[in-house]
């Protein structure tokens, strides 16, 4: 149980229509804001990617499923980025639309292209199994706002992981072609796993205060979950391959070539009409 | 006050209304909690609450949106579940608190809200809104929405 944390402090206040809402406004420390921005950017970039599947998924039900998962992730991103913005007086929209590539803090996994459906599912599997362990642990965060967002998000991510797991089983156990593609997708995705579990200076400092969780401590549970799925699917967990992460990687604002075009599409409308609102 | 997406359920049935109080000066304070993080119906619900209270003669109304504790379908009232079924949406089966936490999940049968048959199948886990899955009854052959346990 956590204290009563209002969404006004966390997110929706300015964006929700109507008025009469006042929030006490819990302000994030500089470190907590940076941490919330990492988590928020992971969710935002992944949501944007999933949105690209709408009208293009293999079946109508998947358009809806990926759209709904993206919507949950947008919800998480809004709460997290709003909280991150309290440290510097920026709104969630300022952070989403008016930062350039080097200011984004997402890990490389989330900006890897959708590829074919199997690649999207492999990315979803890694992302949702990781986020499930992360948010589960953050429910106990000493930062009440982060704990509240995590407790809300973990239940939704549980459905996302179920979705990914079911598809991994189906593709791996389907036709020769679907199995071939699933294996290739897992192989291509795995080099981006390591970055998720790096303990850098910021998380180490925040973990000492009980605000963050050390990513390395999540890895055994993540791998056990992956192994349970892969055993059922007859797949092997790739080992020994890791992406070359330029100094600091996504958490330090150094990104692969895929983030730029994604941001351009996401930000063009807001930047063409600065200050416009619904 | 009903849910804009499921007009047979009040926000109290749904568990979205967490508290409402009036102080001695006549100021009303209402607490709402979102169902899913990205649920767009929350904006509409908040506006509807302000409108309804204003029409009822209260001019000092504040609506607070609360994230913790996180909303769960366990809060849905029994009356609400019965109304849902009559409307053609199967209510959550089982309790969120008792969900199996393993990564490879066993699916429980969901009853058809029209003919009560357990001979149904899931067409899509993500249905018309975030909170629902789409099912089909193999006996009466009707499709129906199922309100997922969260």
Write out the residue ranges for each language-model feature.
Chain B
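AMP-binding/adenylate-forming catalytic domain of the ANL superfamily
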Residues: 63-69
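Charged, alpha-helical interface segments at or near domain boundaries
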Residues: 72-76
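Aromatic-flanked redox-active Cys/Sec active sites in thiol-based oxidoreductases
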Residues: 33-36, 137
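Short, non-transmembrane amphipathic alpha-helical segments
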Residues: 35-60
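A short linear hydrophobic-aromatic micro-motif
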Residues: 18-19, 62, 120-123
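Short edge beta-strands and adjacent turn/loop segments
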Residues: 8-33
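Cys/His-clustered metal-coordination modules, chiefly Zn-binding fingers
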Residues: 79-150
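Short secondary-structure junctions
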Residues: 1-14, 56-58, 114-119
